[in-house]
Regions:
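Hydrophobic anchor at the beta1->P-loop junction of P-loop NTPases
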Residues: 444
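Extended, folded cores of ATP/NTP-driven motor/assembly subunits in large transport
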Residues: 2-407
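Hydrophobic positions on the alpha1 helix immediately C-terminal to the Walker A/P-loop
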Residues: 455
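Conserved lysine of the Walker
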Residues: 452
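Conserved P-loop NTPase
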Residues: 729-779
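P-loop NTPase motor domains
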Residues: 55, 62-81, 92, 256, ...
Length: 779
């Protein structure tokens, strides 16, 4: 392999540096210079890192896995042969104080701390015994020898665009890392036991005459034959010494499935294809020559039927296969090495973890080994500095490199978010912040008993106990009342016979989103009468009469600065009767049942607290006749609460149970569609719950709302619903298994395009559970 060795020697020669014994921990950091855009320099080598997100490889179907594998192979093939690449998986331990500050509910001494303690205990129970304290990140670091920073930047700009494009084909989000983000990786590794400190400020450090190394380096580093010690923690660098003939694609994820701080890196040195082909052709020629010489010797001994020795035949077969890979199957030749560093709090724990890792490698018929007397070089190789100091390289093709695929399962971990369950594959916590999404509206879909209401109530509990946001609930099944009352909220029961009333004409100076509240209210009254006489049946003359009467009814109230008694529909009825037009009497007669008749609940003065931050509108007993009008008044009340809160800078969360009911009536369907599109602008979020997915999807409006929602919780589904959702949301057969005949609280979460299988359980021996459950005998 004269030619190939020459190429490798050239790379080794350029990487070779004079060894200097480090006299301080700062000198042990092999970076010489950094730039704010994230370019690092070590010798004549410049490096740039890209962070990329995980994808759902583990739960993908065989066909999807093949497609992902081929897309990842394309990414590897796109790597420039003039540079080297390092793919790094970083298991980073989450700081306990940071976790508690971001997720646990602080006590407020408002009479609800008992529930906060129960909720916090539930959260802490989900952390213990799982990998929840470990957060995994992925980086791709590209290194290249250039004369100066300008040439390096030009190169990285071109290569970076290519890398991010190929990652997007894999549905992985790639992003460039700046200097602070790259340095944070090393600080988290070297100073993992320290709490999060101030962010790195390059200008401030330069003014003080300090080096960036002071921010990342530990207090001490001690290296021995087969391990090292950083501060009070122990570490060891391993490398892949021998590979199996066939490696399964889950080996990398299994090697990283250890609840410890660790990093695994795969260094890749691509070889120019033309050079690789020439070398393999020369090697094949050498093999054929050896076979010919062997046969000639056998013929000279009159052994004309001798079979070519197995080792020669195998060598010829493998060389031909390699040449075929390079020339007809678009494979590239590359050198690679896999290194891994893991950390522990004690030497005993370190040795135990090392044995666990070696055992995983043996399971895959591979052999990992400890780097003896090379722990410094090994550490500098495995960390994403962009350099390689270990030269135990293995010749690989694109396929054999791609099988070391760095993907496993998507995670959802958004700081400051709400807990929604655990990843069914990795058991990691799923924490999402709907406020950070482009469209934070949500649907929860599932058959009866699948856990829809429980999931919504859990979210309501978190919001009620951790924020000052307003929570408004449309409750057609009377399922939320007990919880709302326990959280010091207000339950407004609306029916023809209830003792609680909502005045349909309630209005204050903040009503609507207009400078003139009267205009908004006049439009509402027109909509109200359209519900009474039938949509489209109001004539222009009747609309004019209603507008005139509305102004008359509110005149004194507005003059008093909205301080006098609020008018009711009865006042409007009397005003209509005073009008000279015959149409006015017709309008009064059409509305008499709902104003002076037996269904006059919305013609009374409001006698409940509509200012409470948590309100459940119980419309179970509304009845078919009163439902359209009841929906209109209730939704008007909800929307105006959203507008008023927006003007105060306050967030509003709306939960609508049995969402499909809203689409039986054109007004409520149109209202929620408009609300869905506009509410983000008003700092509001809508959540729809339903078990009748098929009926909901009969509405094109509902289908559009569902398809455009960035946050969905899909629980156990009926067969017909499952098929509809699979088409609408592009769910694969494997993913559908997570919403097929599964228990309560299990399913799929879709967040920002990520589709993650989850499971969610809550301790039954708690007051919160009894408030949230709807199971008979447990309430």
């Amino acid at each position: 392999m004269v030619r190939l060795i020459k190429t490798l020697q050239q790379a080794l020669k350029m990487d070779r540096e004079k060894f200097k014994v480090p006299r301080s921990v700062q000198q042990a950091i092999p970076i010489q210079r950094i730039w704010p855009d994230g370019v690092f320099q070590s010798g004549t080598k410049f490096s740039k890192s890209f962070r990329f997100s995980d994808i759902n490889y583990a739960i993908a179907s065989k066909e999807d896995k093949t497609e992902m594998f081929l897309d990842y192979s394309e990414l590897l093939n796109a790597l420039d042969s003039g540079a080297s690449a390092k793919i790094t998986l970083n298991n980073r331990r989450i700081n306990k104080e940071e976790f508690e500050a971001s997720l646990l509910l602080p006590m407020k001494e408002d009479g609800l701390d008992e529930y906060r303690k129960e909720y916090n205990e539930m959260l802490l129970s989900k952390v213990s015994g799982t990998n929840n304290s470990i957060y995994q990140e992925r980086y791709l670091t590209v290194s290249v020898h250039k004369k100066n920073i300008d040439e390096a930047r030009t190169y990285f700009a071109r290569v970076g665009t290519d890398i991010i494009t190929h990652l997007s084909k894999l549905s992985s989000i790639g992003e460039e890392m700046d200097a602070e983000q790259r340095l944070q990786i090393f600080r988290d590794f070297f100073r993992a036991e320290e709490p999060q400190c101030f962010p790195f400020d390059m200008k401030a450090f330069a003014k003080k005459g300090s080096s960036f190394k002071d921010w990342i380096c530990p207090q001490s580093m001690e290296f021995s034959k087969d391990c090292f010690k950083i501060n009070e923690r122990f570490g060891r660098v391993l490398y892949m010494q021998d590979y199996a003939s066939y490696v399964k694609d889950d080996m990398i994820s299994e090697l990283c499935d250890l609840s410890r701080d660790l990093m695994l890196s795969i260094d890749i040195l691509p070889v120019p294809t033309d050079e690789a082909v020439r070398e393999i052709q020369n090697r094949l020629l050498g093999v054929e020559t050896n076979v010919t010489n062997w046969q000639r010797r056998q013929n000279a001994n009159n052994n004309f039927s001798a079979i070519v020795p197995y080792d020669m035949e195998l060598q010829r077969k493998e060389t031909k296969e390699m040449l075929d890979d390079l020339t007809t199957r678009d494979q590239r030749m590359m050198f690679g090495i896999l290194t891994m560093v893991h950390m522990a709090d004690s030497k005993k724990q370190l040795d135990s973890d090392t044995e666990s890792i070696l055992s995983v490698a043996r399971k895959h018929l591979c052999q990992m080994a400890t780097l003896k007397w090379q722990q410094v070089d090994g550490l500098n190789t495995v960390l994403p500095y962009g350099i390689r100091k270990i030269n135990a390289l293995r010749t690989l093709t694109t396929e054999s490199t791609a099988v070391l695929i760095p993907f496993h399962t998507q995670e959802i971990m958004q700081p400051g978010g709400i807990y929604y369950g655990q990843n069914a594959v990795s058991k990691n916590m799923l924490v999402a912040d709907r406020r950070k999404l482009l469209n934070g509206n949500s649907f929860r879909l599932g058959v009866s008993g699948s856990g829809k209401s429980f999931s919504a109530k859990e979210e309501i509990v978190d919001l009620a106990l951790s924020t000052e946001d307003d929570i408004l609930i449309l409750d057609p099944e009377s399922e939320f009342g007990s919880l709302v009352e326990a959280l010091n909220g207000e339950v407004i029961s609306i029916s023809a016979t209830s003792h609680t009333h909502l005045n349909a004409l309630d209005m204050d100076s903040a009503y609507g989103n207009d400078k003139n509240p009267l205009i908004e209210k006049s439009e509402f009254i027109l909509s109200l009468f359209e519900q009474l006489v039938g949509a489209g049946n109001l004539s222009a003359k009747e609309k004019s009469i209603l507008d005139r009467c509305t102004a008359d009814v509110y005149r004194e109230y507005i003059r008093s600065g909205y301080q006098s008694e609020v008018p009711t529909l009865k006042d409007l009825y009397r005003q209509l009767m005073l009008q000279p037009e015959e149409e006015a009497r017709g309008l009064a007669l059409s509305s008499e049942l709902f104003i002076n008749g037996s269904l006059n609940t919305f013609a009374q003065k409001t006698n409940v607290n509509t200012k409470n931050r948590i309100i459940a509108y119980d419309i179970r007993e509304l009845g078919e006749q009163l439902m359209p009008l009841g929906m209109l008044v209730t939704l008007d009340s909800i929307f105006n609460r959203v507008i008023q809160n927006w003007k105060k800078g306050k967030t509003t969360w709306i939960f609508a149970d049995e969402f499909y009911l809203l689409f039986r009536y054109q007004y409520s369907a149109d209202f929620f569609y408009r609300l869905y599109k506009r509410i983000r602008k008003y700092q509001g979020f809508v959540t729809g719950l339903t078990q009748n997915v098929e009926e909901l999807l009969k509405s094109d409006t509902a289908r559009l709302m569902l398809a455009n929602s960035e946050f969905l919780i899909l629980l156990n589904q009926a067969t017909t619903d499952r098929d509809e959702l699979a088409v609408l949301l592009n769910i694969s057969e494997n993913q559908l298994s997570y919403i097929t005949n599964v228990g309560a609280g299990k399913g799929l979460i879709r967040c920002s395009g990520n589709l993650v299988p989850f499971e969610n359980s809550f301790p039954k021996n708690t007051k919160l559970y009894r408030l949230m459950t709807t199971k008979p005998g447990e309430c």
